[in-house]
């Protein structure tokens, strides 16, 4: 056991985690050169295309160190995006140490900080690594000082490497073997294994990634899930060397995969403890804290026949993604679907794309909203995650919106732009600290403004240099109203949005204008209105298409023309009564872009 090292790699987006993982795998001979490809661990097509890591992946490698010993390295590559930070905290729970990778050109960024604090809270040994030293812009001395200044760990002798060229990667491994402690645990005690991650395989059922904390797990053992008390047979187990390799046992301190032929998706939840049925452990390991979704959106299948397969797909996906929340919902405009909760907009996009790709579904998404806390006049408190669930205005005593605490790190040059942006987003500054050339800003900004497009706008006002990390702080009373959209005097529930009263007029007007461009012209006039309660705040009309009925009259009599026009008018009137308007998917997404283009 003293030769096992469990660690994960944490860093900000694009600081080179996945590339470093590739080099480590290559040096330790996990894959032959022929099988080696860029970003081996980003196994989803989606991860490759966007160049980001979404799921944490684990690998077991053997490394022969300079002291002659062979060490078993179990390492986990983690995502860097703030939307996937729960993936990071789960991976860290399975480790004794973490490599903090910092780009020697960019320096410390907000996510570096957030992930590093998560690791320190879990009492992990953090080993700083300066990556990308082959870049002409690299300044390792400055960045080492920055790490000490901002993060507060000693980085004077931080390992310097370039994952792209492979320089210094062996030093990283040597340092890691030296500094990260071996796992603690009792190899002879009763079995306790923590489920770090699970996914669904069509042939094997549920596959779980486990970290053995105490005891040993052998193939063929009877295994008990501690939260449900159900027992299963350990049919197959093994490790990833990125390839799936079968083993006969997993020893104390190791990380590996396990197949127990669990067909029920909820059979082995992530964060649960597995123990042996014969000699069970007394208590479960501390799991993970549940993450609360920050953004909710309705997902509906385009054709209602897909509802069943959509439900199964969501079930399988939520096994793999512990933070996805969903409950059935129906909408008068879109039929049956699900209300899903996500950690952020990127998370929502990824889930939607995964559902469409991996499970072949066609989906319509409604605009995302955050959760509001409503105190009714009867002094009840309810939580509303969809505009259609908002009680009537005269029943609301107070409406409170969620406030996010945003930590931003940015170069001084862009401070003015960023502060202007935060004020425009109704932000309140709570702190500002200068670290050398960097400024650490803390603002309290309404969550609704943060999840909408704050990140994109922050990046564009600071030319990509600012970085953001946010978390939910509290609910705060605010003057929010619901803007409804009426099409031909009928409310479309999927188009409603909740916004601040000061912005309501503008948002309503913009939304109506956007709708006008997006709804195709019909044979009759379509009236689009935005309303707060019964008060109409904006209106616009999509003009009808009409045939020129007079084309066949040469010069003819005026009464003849009048008769034809009158006939056409009556036809249109009849059509308008029975006609219904098909809304394209773009119309539902238009709400997202309200407030973006006029800045």
UniProtKB/Swiss-Prot annotation:
Binding of GTP, residues: 14-19, 131-134
Keywords on record: Cell inner membrane, Cell membrane, GTP-binding, Hydrolase, Membrane, Nucleotide-binding, Protein biosynthesis
Primary enzyme class: hydrolase
This enzyme's EC code(s): 3.6.5.n1
Annotated compartments: Cell inner membrane
InterPro entries: EF-4, EFG_III/V, EFG_V-like, EFTu-like_2, G_TR_CS, LepA_C_sf, LepA_CTD, LepA_IV
GO biological process: positive regulation of translation
UniProt key word ATP-binding: no
GO (cellular component) term, any one: plasma membrane
Catalytic activity reported: GTP + H2O = GDP + phosphate + H(+)
Residue span, tr-type G domain: 2-184
NCBIfam families: lepA, small_GTP
This protein's name: Elongation factor 4
Organism: Salmonella arizonae (strain ATCC BAA-731 / CDC346-86 / RSK2980)
Protein's gene: lepA
């Amino acid at each position: 056991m003293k030769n096992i090292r469990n660690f994960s790699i944490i860093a900000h987006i694009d600081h080179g985690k996945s590339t470093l993982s590739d080099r480590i795998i290559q040096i330790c001979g996990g894959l032959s050169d022929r099988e080696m490809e860029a970003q081996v661990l980003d196994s989803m097509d989606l991860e490759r295309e966007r160049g980001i890591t979404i799921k944490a992946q684990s690998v077991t490698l053997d490394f022969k160190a300079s002291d002659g010993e062979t060490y078993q390295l179990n390492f986990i590559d983690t995502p860097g995006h703030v939307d996937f930070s729960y993936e990071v905290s789960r991976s860290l729970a399975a480790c004794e140490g973490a490599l903090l990778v910092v780009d020697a050109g960019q320096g410390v960024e907000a996510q570096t900080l957030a992930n590093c604090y998560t690791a320190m809270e879990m009492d992990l040994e953090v080993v700083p690594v300066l990556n990308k030293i082959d870049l002409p812009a690299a300044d390792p001395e400055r960045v080492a000082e920055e790490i000490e200044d901002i993060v507060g760990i000693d980085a004077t002798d931080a390992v310097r490497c370039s994952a792209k060229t492979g320089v210094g990667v062996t030093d990283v491994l040597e340092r890691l073997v030296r500094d990260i402690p071996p796992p603690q645990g009792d190899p002879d005690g009763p079995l306790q294994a923590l489920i770090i991650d699970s996914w669904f395989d069509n042939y094997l059922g549920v596959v779980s990634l486990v970290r053995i904390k105490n005891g040993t797990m052998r193939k063929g053992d009877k295994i008990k899930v501690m939260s449900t008390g159900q027992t299963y047979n350990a049919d197959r187990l093994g490790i990833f060397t990125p390839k799936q390799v079968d083993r006969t046992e997993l020893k104390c301190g190791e990380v590996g995969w396990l197949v127990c032929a669990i067909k029920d998706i909820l059979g082995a939840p992530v964060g649960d403890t597995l123990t042996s049925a014969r000699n069970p452990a007394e208590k479960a390991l501390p799991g993970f804290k549940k993450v609360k979704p920050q953004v909710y959106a309705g997902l509906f299948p385009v054709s209602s026949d897909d509802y069943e397969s959509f439900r199964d797909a969501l079930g399988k996906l939520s096994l793999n993604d512990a933070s996805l929340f969903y409950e059935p919902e129906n909408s008068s405009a879109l039929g049956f679907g699900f209300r899903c909760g996500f950690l952020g907009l990127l998370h929502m996009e990824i889930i939607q794309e995964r559902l469409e790709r991996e499970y072949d579904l066609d989906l319509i998404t409604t605009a995302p909203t955050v959760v509001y806390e409503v105190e009714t006049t009867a002094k009840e408190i309810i939580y509303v995650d969809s505009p259609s669930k908002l009680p009537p205005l005269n029943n609301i005593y107070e409406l409170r919106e969620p406030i996010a605490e945003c930590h931003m790190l940015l170069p001084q040059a862009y401070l003015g732009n960023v502060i202007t942006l935060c004020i425009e987003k109704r932000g309140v500054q709570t702190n500002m600290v200068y670290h050398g050339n960097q400024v650490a800003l803390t603002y309290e900004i309404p969550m609704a403004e943060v999840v909408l497009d704050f990140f994109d706008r922050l990046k564009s006002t600071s030319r990509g240099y600012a970085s953001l990390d946010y978390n939910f702080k509290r609910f705060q009373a605010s003057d929010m109203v619901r803007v409804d959209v009426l099409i031909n005097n009928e409310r479309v529930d999927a188009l409603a949005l909740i916004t601040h009263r000061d912005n309501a007029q503008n948002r309503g007007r913009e939304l109506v204008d956007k709708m006008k461009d997006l709804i195709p012209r019909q044979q009759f006039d379509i009236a689009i209105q935005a309303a707060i309660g019964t008060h109409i705040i904006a209106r616009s009309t999509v003009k009808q298409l009409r045939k020129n009925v007079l084309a066949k009259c040469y010069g003819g009599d005026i009464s003849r023309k009048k008769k034809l026009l009158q006939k056409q008018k009556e036809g249109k009137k009849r059509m308008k009564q029975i006609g219904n308007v098909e809304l394209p998917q773009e119309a539902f997404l238009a709400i997202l872009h309200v407030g973006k283009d006029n800045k």
